[in-house]
């Protein structure tokens, strides 16, 4: 869900569940056992507002970061060349609570929509999810992050 490695492996992006904020932490600090919690925390950056609530994150080899946005049935992209600006990659009423993202070698971004808001816990005991669940894809002409 809300975790993605940067294209060069130097930053790990994350967001709290259903958060509107994006954060990153230095990966070198995460693997350095000599650092205490405060030293690791000192490498955390607030990357700003994600343009909406959601917790699915992904990144591509070009350095772009993708985030789900359940409020607008959408996936957003923070382009590496626009210094933090977010744009809509896809918005579709069928993307009911987009959740997990994956950039694939075929140039597509794959998206699951889990219909979380339709679960019985949120609908007075009535499960309103529609099955079978759907895996969506949209062409982004990007490649996945490959670190080794």
Describe every region a protein language model picked out:
Residues 1-29:
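Beta-propeller domains
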Residues 1-11, 46-64, 93-106:
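Beta-rich, blade/repeat-based domains predominating
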Residues 6-7, 12-17, 59-60, 65-70, ...:
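Conserved beta-strand positions in repeat-built beta-propeller and related beta-rich domains
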Residues 20-22, 73-75, 118-119, 135:
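Structural signal for beta-propeller blades
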Residues 24-37, 79-82, 140-144:
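Short loop/turn segments immediately following beta-strands, especially the blade-tip
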Residues 39-49, 86-90:
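A short beta-strand motif characteristic of beta-propeller blades
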Residues 71, 85-96, 102-103, 114-116, ...:
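Beta-propeller domains with acidic blade repeats across secreted/periplasmic ectodomains
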Residues 102-148:
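Blade-level signature of beta-propeller repeat domains, shared across WD40, Kelch, NHL, RCC1
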